[in-house]
Regions:
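Short, highly charged
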Residues: 48-90, 94
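Intrinsically disordered, low-complexity regulatory segments enriched in Ser/Thr/Pro
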Residues: 76-151
Length: 167
């Protein structure tokens, strides 16, 4: 195996190290990722409220667990394992999901200010009016039970934004 052959493996290892460092920095290393709860309207409102209080254009690398135990055809690969809240886009906050093991690349979700989730899909401009000739992203509604948050992570998420009240 030459250096060129090792590039994808090294890139994956670097990604894993960065994920681990970020989790450690945010005190997330002890959380059991399989204890997920479905996204409810109340939880969606909570996440939207928190996102609305984040400084505009600030990149926030908070990782949330994505529950893939229930099949959602065409939305996520079965091994999708992390979501992070990214910088503000348009009228909502972009959630980018990473699925390196499936080879399917990166999917994007947008959490609107009213707590609704949308999937951002790349589309061919030939099939959609109002999109630039080179194509672009379109938002389509997605189900509310895709994202799972553990109670511990919800608490940490809240504490992250309110450090004075953190226990």
């Amino acid at each position: 195996m030459g250096p060129v052959d090792d590039a994808p493996r090294q890139e994956h290892e670097i990604e894993e190290i960065e994920f681990a460092e970020e989790r450690e920095r945010l005190r997330l290393s002890g959380i059991e990722s399989r204890r997920g709860v479905r996204m409810t309207p109340e939880l969606a409102a909570f996440v939207a409220d928190v996102a609305g209080r984040l400084p505009t254009r600030k990149l926030v690398s908070l990782f949330l667990h994505v529950d893939t135990r229930k099949e959602k055809a065409g939305l996520f690969g079965r091994r999708t394992h992390t979501v992070r809240v990214c910088e503000e886009v348009g009228k909502g906050w972009e959630l980018a999901t990473f699925a390196p093991e499936t080879g399917s690349g990166e999917h994007r979700l947008v959490l609107s200010s009213d707590g609704l989730l949308f999937e951002a899909r790349r589309v061919d401009a030939a099939f959609h009016r109002g999109i630039p000739k080179e194509g672009g992203l379109t938002l389509v509604p997605t189900s509310e039970d895709v994202i799972a948050l553990t109670p511990d992570l919800r608490s940490l998420f809240s504490d992250y934004l309110n450090p004075r009240t953190a226990t």
